[in-house]
Amino acid sequence: MHIQVINFGINVSHEDFVVGATELAPNFASIPGLISKHWLGDEENKVYGGVYVWESKEHCEAYKAGEIFSMVMSSENHVSPTSKDFGVLEAPTKITT
């Protein structure tokens, strides 16, 4: 398992972001190796993003080489996007999941 966290500011309203995200969500549902994506939003500070749970680091790397990731990172509505990957500590995670 592998975790990716993407954060960015937005230059649209919260409501417009939610509408756009809801329209885009089906595109993420079919990405190979993506177990889940949790959409994040901090309306007060206009910071949004997602926590992606991948089957493997290789699946995450394949996503980062693809069109959807490129779109997320270069969208005119996203301000200063960042992406950070994390390995999962399996032993303690098994206890808490």
Which stretches of residues belong to each language-model region?
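Short S/T/G/P-rich N-terminal loop/turn motif that feeds into the first structured element of a domain
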Residues: 1-48, 57-65, 77-97
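Short, polar loop motifs at secondary-structure junctions
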Residues: 68
